[in-house]
């Protein structure tokens, strides 16, 4: 029984389509290689799958560029002409844009104004005024920030100065430094400035021989003070 003719149409199943593509691609490359070996032909095949994956075959001892150049020479068709024209058009547009920008910069510097009519001059004037307004607003904002920063610094310095003055006033009223309580054991230290730059620490030491009869406390006396040399 003769085999029925296979209908050529798109394979809907993606997996089957990919398998068929791989098999037929390998078969095509095999035939191209046979043509190269058997017939001394130069063959170049460029293929893209449905997922845009590139596959290509090129005969040994040649390149794709050589094949394309040979095709252009024999067929008298410039493959790169269209691409070159596009590149030239892009270059022309970029040069035109560059010239316009240079002209606008010069006009904002007061140059190239003779070629402008009254409407263009008014439009340029409005643009410059808006620019000046934005610059002034930014300048005032920057100055305001600097003023606020300076005020905060001055306030901090004033607070430090007030604290120092307050401390000096306290020391002027009482040359002794503050008595430090030492957890209820009555051993305390006084800072005392005497004899120029010499500093001494005076420590009260509990003396059990001095006793307050009414309160059950020992009273400090001269013998309870111990002097330690601190600085010289």
Swiss-Prot record:
Inducers of expression: Positively regulated by the meristem identity proteins APETALA1 and LEAFY with the cooperation of UFO. Repressed by silencing mediated by polycomb group (PcG) protein complex containing EMF1 and EMF2.
Entry's Gene Ontology cellular component terms: nucleus
Protein's cellular compartments: Nucleus
Entry keywords, A to Z: Activator, Coiled coil, Developmental protein, Differentiation, DNA-binding, Flowering, Nucleus, Transcription, Transcription regulation
Entry-linked CDD domains: MADS_MEF2_like
InterPro entries: MADS-box/MEF2_TF (IPR050142), MEF2-like_N (IPR033896), TF_Kbox (IPR002487), TF_MADSbox (IPR002100), TF_MADSbox_sf (IPR036879)
GO aspect biological process, one term: positive regulation of transcription by RNA polymerase II
Effect noted on mutating residue 145 to S: In strain: cv. Lisse
Outcome (variant: residue 31 to R): In strain: cv. Lisse
Entry annotated with the keyword Nucleus: yes
Oligomeric form and interacting partners: Forms a heterodimer with PISTILLATA, capable of binding to CArG-box sequences. AP3/PI heterodimer binds AP1 or SEP3 to form complexes.
Protein name (Swiss-Prot/TrEMBL): Floral homeotic protein APETALA 3
Tissue expression notes: Expressed in petals and stamens.
Ranges where the MADS-box domain occurs: 3-57
Impact reported for residue 212 to C: In strain: cv. Li-8
Effect of residue 109 to V: In strain: cv. Kas-1
UniProt cross-references to PANTHER family, sorted A to Z: SERUM RESPONSE FACTOR HOMOLOG
Record's function text: Probable transcription factor involved in the genetic control of flower development. Is required for normal development of petals and stamens in the wild-type flower. Forms a heterodimer with PISTILLATA that is required for autoregulation of both AP3 and PI genes. AP3/PI heterodimer interacts with APETALA1 or SEPALLATA3 to form a ternary complex that could be responsible for the regulation of the genes involved in the flower development. AP3/PI heterodimer activates the expression of NAP. AP3/PI prevents GATA22/GNL and GATA21/GNC expression.
PROSITE patterns membership: K_BOX (PS51297), MADS_BOX_1 (PS00350), MADS_BOX_2 (PS50066)
SMART domains per record: MADS
